[in-house]
């Protein structure tokens, strides 16, 4: 059992707005690759490529635990 309360898990998360949907990835397409603009924190204004699970559309706000990593680009075969 985790010692953290559910609200504590996202207390250090940073909000980011989805600005573009790039495509689907994952073996069965369960992950969406999106470009997001960081809204707060030291990387405010930076645009990142991230993978998101679940339904997402342009304008949605996603909470990022960290803003250092970017997702790899989707390779076309």
From Swiss-Prot:
SUPFAM superfamilies membership: Nucleic acid-binding proteins (SSF50249)
GO process terms (BP): maturation of SSU-rRNA; ribosomal small subunit assembly; translation
This protein's GO CC annotations: cytosolic small ribosomal subunit
Annotated keywords: Ribonucleoprotein, Ribosomal protein
Signal sequence bounds: none
CDD domains: S1_S28E
Keyword Ribonucleoprotein attributed: yes
GO molecular function, one term: structural constituent of ribosome
Domain of life: Archaea
InterPro entries: NA-bd_OB-fold, Ribosomal_eS28, Ribosomal_eS28_CS
Record bears the keyword Ribosomal protein: yes
Family to which this protein belongs: Belongs to the eukaryotic ribosomal protein eS28 family.
HAMAP family: Ribosomal_eS28
PANTHER family, alphabetized: 40S RIBOSOMAL PROTEIN S28, SMALL RIBOSOMAL SUBUNIT PROTEIN ES28
Protein name, per record: Small ribosomal subunit protein eS28
């Amino acid at each position: 059992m985790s010692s953290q309360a559910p609200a504590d898990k996202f207390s250090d998360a940073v909000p980011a707005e989805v600005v573009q949907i790039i495509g689907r990835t994952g073996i069965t397409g369960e992950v969406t690759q999106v470009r997001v603009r960081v809204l707060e924190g030291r990387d405010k204004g930076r645009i990142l490529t991230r993978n998101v699970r679940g339904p997402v559309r342009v304008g949605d706000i996603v909470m990022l635990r960290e803003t250092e990593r970017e997702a790899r680009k989707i390779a076309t075969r």
